[in-house]
Amino acid sequence: MVPRVPQPGIWCPAVTFFDPKTDTLDLASQERYYAYLARSGLTGLVILGTNAEAFLLTREERAQLIATARKAVGPDFPIMAGVGAHSTRQVLEHINDASTAGANYVLVLPPAYFGKATTPPVIKSFFDDVSCQSPLPVVIYNFPGVCNGIDLDSDMITTIARKNPNVVGVKLTCASVGKITRLAATLPPAEFSVFGGQSDFLIGGLSVGSAGCIAAFANIYELYKAGKVDQAMELHRKAALAESPCKSGIATTKYAAAIFSAKAAGIEDAEEKLRPRKPYDPPSEAAKQEVRKVMAEVAAIEAGLS
């Protein structure tokens, strides 16, 4: 049975494959990819996160991806599903769909479409309503870059978590190690998991009490936890450099997955299938070249690690 609180480690936010001719979901490639990721040393999968282009998917497609993931990874592998939307009602619909499709946790962005109207009381009321009605444990997703600049501070997150036992964690894509420190010092890890949202501050977060990261590079976590700090730091520095070109937009993120993890999963024509969904463009040749360079360096370091 999957624990109520997400377990420490690396949770991978999976990208979404599309049929390049029809711009519809390629569920066969998706299933193969999910199965590969589940075998690669991860703690769990995140379906329908930012990298999955969740806001470009229909409600039916979102449910299809979660169900495909559950089929691919079996009944016991942990799945966290993104359920971000603009209203409380929409979020609750997505949560119920996720529960039916087999998710174990839901990852919830704050409402943000009307930025100036999204006041602290609105945010607190939103998470109160969602957590009370959700059949699944809730993980707060703090990502100012996709939320009109709305940034939940550690006091607000603590207040929400203490009031709502069904809020069991947070993903911080705000790059604040200080926020990780304060939350880890305030909320017991048995009741609340604090995850970083980018690989480039993974070790910084671990050193002050984070549970891990919702990003790539599971081997950095394992090396650090095994006490191989120098090796972990060497790979971590390269991973941090890789974050910049690979995270400059969804197009480069998906291209990096196409030439690295999708290739390892044995998925044919991955570059075509991992183009961003329309109307967004694929990466430029210059961007591709930079991604290839940094990913080759990371792969070389990985190959030399014992």
Where do the model's predicted regions map?
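Glycine-rich phosphate-binding "P-loop"
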Residues: Y141-G145, N166-V167, E268, L274
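Short, conserved catalytic or adaptor-binding loops enriched in Gly and charged residues
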Residues: P3-V5, I160, S261
